[in-house]
């Protein structure tokens, strides 16, 4: 089970290898609390992998969010302000916003709140295209999601367990492209 790290961060104890206070509830049985274990997490990318001892009725397939364009229909699943099992719909408003240390994220107009954070953003074919994170409180309706490609890159490391750390070289940059061909790195600031 993948979620946002900030959703479970106050429950993470790197020294504790067993189950903790962390649990999940299924939409079909909101009364039962199922113990969960944090396998791995990355506080920089704000992602966490949990292990839950259940066999789910349905597992979403990971999509390829690099194929999404502005105007594509998407839906966000979550529990906004505690309202369990909520599905909101919208479109991709922008495909390449640089608002976090993650890099390029999607801007979406689907209604999301803090309870949606960590939930999937799915396309019309029920494939996960991104992981939702709550928008900016002071700008209502401005919401974002991390493309599933980031998850695909980090998932093997999360499975290895523990905390994933990133080095910092003192510079910030992005991939330099010419006619959609990667040509190197463009340094934006030092």
Description of each model-found segment:
Residues 21-30, 63-84:
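Short glycine/Trp-rich loop-beta-loop segment that forms part of the substrate-binding cleft
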């Amino acid at each position: 089970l993948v979620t946002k790290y900030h959703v479970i961060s106050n429950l993470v104890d790197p020294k504790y290898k067993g189950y903790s206070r962390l649990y999940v509830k299924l939409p079909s049985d909101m009364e039962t609390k199922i113990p969960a274990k944090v396998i791995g997490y990355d506080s920089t990318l704000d992602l966490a992998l949990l292990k839950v001892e259940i066999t789910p009725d349905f597992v979403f397939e990971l999509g390829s969010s690099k194929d999404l364009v502005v105007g594509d229909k998407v839906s966000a699943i979550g529990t906004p302000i505690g309202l369990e099992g909520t599905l909101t719909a919208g479109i991709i408003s922008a495909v390449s916003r640089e608002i976090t240390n993650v890099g390029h994220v999607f801007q979406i107009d689907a209604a999301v709140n803090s309870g949606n954070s960590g939930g999937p953003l799915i396309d019309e074919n029920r494939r996960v295209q991104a992981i939702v994170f709550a928008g900016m409180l002071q700008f209502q309706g401005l919401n974002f999601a991390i493309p599933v490609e980031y998850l695909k890159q980090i998932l093997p490391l999360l499975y290895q367990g523990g905390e994933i750390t990133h080095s910092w070289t003192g510079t910030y940059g992005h991939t330099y492209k010419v006619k959609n061909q990667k040509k190197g790195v463009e340094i934006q600031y030092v």
